[in-house]
Amino acid sequence: MKKEELRLIFMGTADFAVPALRALVENGYQVKAVVTMPDKPMGRGHKVSPSMVKLYAQELGLPILQPDNLNEESFLDELRTYQPHLQIVVAFRMLPRSVWQMPPMGTINLHGSLLPMYRGAAPINHAIRHGDTETGVTTFRLRHEIDTGEVLLQEKLPIGHEETFGELYERMATLGASVLVHTVDLFLEGEPVSIPQEQLPGYVGARPAPKIFKDDCRIDWDKPAEEVHNFIRSISPAPTAWTKLHRPGMESIVLKIYRTQVIEREPRHRGRFGSIIWDKKNLDVMTRKGVIRILSLQMPGKKQMDAASFLNGFALSSDMYIE
C-alpha cells in the first residue's frame, strides 16, 4: 500500500502528541480526522480552551471530532465514515473496544517508556523519580488492558542526572514522533511483527506509573538527598514540588521548588532534616542523608526566582526550618 492510500485517524490531546501528528503529515501520510477531548476550562482563569492537538489540527484544516463519550453511536458512526485503515493514539484516553477494534489494521499507541516499564499515565515522571539513567519510547498494538499490547518498536533515550521532567518530556515527544512514523511505515509493507511484552529480551515484569496529583507533590525531606532531588526534578515545572517554610510566631510560607542540586550525599553537617543552611548566594536544606541546594524556587504571588534573589529579598533566621 502507498502512503497516500493509507487512511489514518489520529487521537490525542496533550502537547506531547503534537510532534507526532506533525511528523505524520510532513511525511506524507493522510490523516483523515483528528479525535481529541472537548474544550474545557484550563488555567487559573478557568477559561474554556481547546487542546493543543485541536489547535494544530485547525492549522492543518483537518476534520476534528470531540466526543464527550467514546461509546456514543453518533461518534462511532462518524468515525466509520472515514473508513480508517489504522488508528493512532498518542497521549489520549482509554478507548473502548468498539473504537480500537474498528480499523482493519487495528489501533496503535505511542507510549513514553520502554514497556512494560512504567505502564500508566505518568511514565516520564516516574522514570526520573526512580533515578533511572535511561528511558525510551514504545509503539504497540492497543488492547483492552492499558499499556499491555504487543510491542512494535522501541527506542532508548538517556536521562541526564540534572534533567527535569519538562526537559525530558520535550526530547521524548521528538523521539516518539520519529519512532511513530517508522512504525506506520511498517504497515505499508504488510502486517508488522509485534512481540508480547513478556517475551521481550530482559523482561523482569511490569512497573506502574500512575497519574500524579498535586497532593502527591509535597517534598519529604526525611529521605536521602538523591531521592529528594529526583522527586523534585520529576515534577518540574509541573505539577511542581512544594514544601513549607516554618517561621516561629508567624504563618508558614509555601515554597514551590523547581530545580535543585545534590551537594552532599554523605552528611557532613549535623542537624535535623529540614534544617536550612544559607549564605548570601546559596540556600541548602538538610535531608535524612545529605544536603540539597535549592537553585530555583517560587513564593506565593511571586515569579519563579533563583536562590540568590530569594535570599536578597527574604530575611531567614536560625529558628526557621523547612518541612
Swiss-Prot record:
CC annotations in GO: cytosol
Entry superkingdom: Bacteria
Reactions mediated catalytically: L-methionyl-tRNA(fMet) + (6R)-10-formyltetrahydrofolate = N-formyl-L-methionyl-tRNA(fMet) + (6S)-5,6,7,8-tetrahydrofolate + H(+)
Uppermost EC category: transferase
Single GO term (MF): methionyl-tRNA formyltransferase activity
One Pfam family in the UniProt entry: Formyl_trans_N
Keyword set, alphabetical order: Protein biosynthesis, Transferase
Binding of (6S)-5,6,7,8-tetrahydrofolate, residues: S113, L114, L115, P116
EC number: 2.1.2.9
InterPro entries for this protein: Fmt, Formyl_trans_C, Formyl_transf_N, Formyl_transf_N_sf, Formyl_transferase-like_C_sf, Met-tRNA-FMT_C, Met-tRNA-FMT_N
Family: Belongs to the Fmt family.
HAMAP family: Formyl_trans
Biological role stated in the UniProt entry: Attaches a formyl group to the free amino group of methionyl-tRNA(fMet). The formyl group appears to play a dual role in the initiator identity of N-formylmethionyl-tRNA by promoting its recognition by IF2 and preventing the misappropriation of this tRNA by the elongation apparatus.
Annotated protein name in UniProt: Methionyl-tRNA formyltransferase
Organism name: Porphyromonas gingivalis (strain ATCC 33277 / DSM 20709 / CIP 103683 / JCM 12257 / NCTC 11834 / 2561)
Lineage: Bacteria, Pseudomonadati, Bacteroidota, Bacteroidia, Bacteroidales
